[in-house]
C-alpha cells in the first residue's frame, strides 16, 4: 500500500511538473535574472517525455527479450557450458560507457534515436541477464521435482513453475536497468535523439543553468515513478503475497 501511494504521489508530481514548467517563466526569471531566455521553449516537455519513454521502453524491452532468452538457454543442459562465455561478453559490453557506444554507432547507423537504442540496450543486458540467471537458480529443486512427478513436460515446467517463481528477481533486474536507462537516455540528445536531455544539452552548451534544471527535474521524477511502478509489480509477483 505504501509503495502504491508513493507511485501515485510521484505520478501526480510528474504531471504537475510537466503542466507547470511551460508557465514557470516568471519563477525562472526571478531565479536567473541574468538570463534573457530562462525558459526552454523549443519543444514541449510532454512530447519530450513521451519520446524519452519510447527510447527507454524499446531499448529495455529488447534487452529484456535478449537477456532473459540468453539466461534461459544457459540454464538448460544444452547451453550450460556457455554461461561463463555469456557472462564475460556481458561484462565487456558493460565496461563501455554509453557515450562511447554512441560515438561508435553514429558513423555506422547515423544520428537520431537508433544509436541511442543500441547503446541503452547493450547497457541493460548485464543487469537483466544476471537477474534472470539468479532468479532461475533460486527456484527450489523441490518445485521442479514436484512438477516432474505430476507429469509436466520441460516446457510446462518452465512456464508454470520456473518463470513464475523467478519472476520477482527478474523484474528487479529489469527495474534496475530501466531506471539506469532513464538517466542515461538523456545523453542520447547529444546524437540528435529527442529526449528530456535536450534542455540539459542546450543548457550546458549555452551556459543556461535554468534549462539544465528544467530537463533534469522531469528525468529525476520519471526515474522515481518507474522505480515505484516496478517495485509494485515485483511485490505483486512475489508468491508469498498470494499465499
Give the ranges of each region predicted by the language model:
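Faces of alpha-helical transmembrane segments in polytopic inner-membrane proteins
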Residues: 66, 90-98, 118-133, 137, ...
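C-terminal transmembrane helix and the adjacent membrane-cytosol boundary/short C-terminal tail
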Residues: 5-9, 18-22, 137, 213-243
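Cytoplasmic-entry segments and transmembrane alpha-helices of multi-pass inner-membrane transporters
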Residues: 69-105, 130-137, 145
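N-terminal, non-cleaved signal-anchor transmembrane helix
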Residues: 1-61, 238-243
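Transmembrane alpha-helices
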Residues: 122, 154-188, 214, 219, ...
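Glycine-rich helix-loop "coupling/hinge" segments at transmembrane-helix boundaries
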Residues: 107, 184-219, 238, 243
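Short helix-to-coil transition segments within interhelical loops
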Residues: 136-142, 146-166, 192-194
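Loop-to-helix entry region at the N-terminal start of transmembrane alpha-helices
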Residues: 44-59, 106-127, 166-167, 211, ...
Amino acid at each position: 500500500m505504501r509503495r502504491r501511494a508513493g507511485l501515485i504521489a510521484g505520478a501526480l508530481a510528474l504531471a504537475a511538473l510537466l503542466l507547470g514548467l511551460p508557465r514557470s517563466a516568471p519563477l525562472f526569471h526571478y531565479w536567473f535574472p541574468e538570463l534573457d531566455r530562462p525558459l526552454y521553449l523549443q519543444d514541449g516537455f510532454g512530447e519530450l517525455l513521451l519520446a524519452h519513454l519510447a527510447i527507454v521502453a524499446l531499448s529495455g524491452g529488447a534487452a529484456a527479450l535478449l537477456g532473459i532468452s540468453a539466461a534461459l538457454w544457459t540454464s538448460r543442459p544444452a547451453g550450460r557450458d556457455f554461461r561463463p562465455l555469456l557472462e564475460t561478453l556481458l561484462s565487456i559490453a558493460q565496461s563501455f560507457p554509453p557515450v562511447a557506444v554512441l560515438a561508435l554507432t553514429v558513423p555506422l547507423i547515423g544520428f537520431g534515436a537508433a544509436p541511442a537504442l543500441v547503446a541503452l540496450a547493450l547497457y541493460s543486458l548485464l543487469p537483466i541477464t544476471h537477474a534472470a540467471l539468479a532468479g532461475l537458480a533460486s527456484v527450489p529443486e523441490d518445485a521442479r521435482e514436484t512438477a516432474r512427478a505430476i507429469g509436466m513436460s520441460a516446457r510446462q515446467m518452465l512456464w508454470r513453475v520456473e518463470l513464475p517463481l523467478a519472476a520477482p528477481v527478474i523484474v528487479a533486474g529489469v527495474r534496475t536497468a530501466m531506471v539506469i536507462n532513464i538517466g542515461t537516455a538523456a545523453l542520447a540528445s547529444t546524437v540528435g535523439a529527442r529526449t528530456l536531455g535536450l534542455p540539459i544539452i542546450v543548457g550546458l552548451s549555452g551556459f543556461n543553468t535554468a534549462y539544465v534544471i528544467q530537463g533534469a527535474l522531469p528525468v529525476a521524477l520519471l526515474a522515481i515513478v518507474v522505480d515505484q511502478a516496478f517495485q509494485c509489480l515485483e511485490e505483486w509477483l512475489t508468491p508469498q503475497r498470494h499465499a
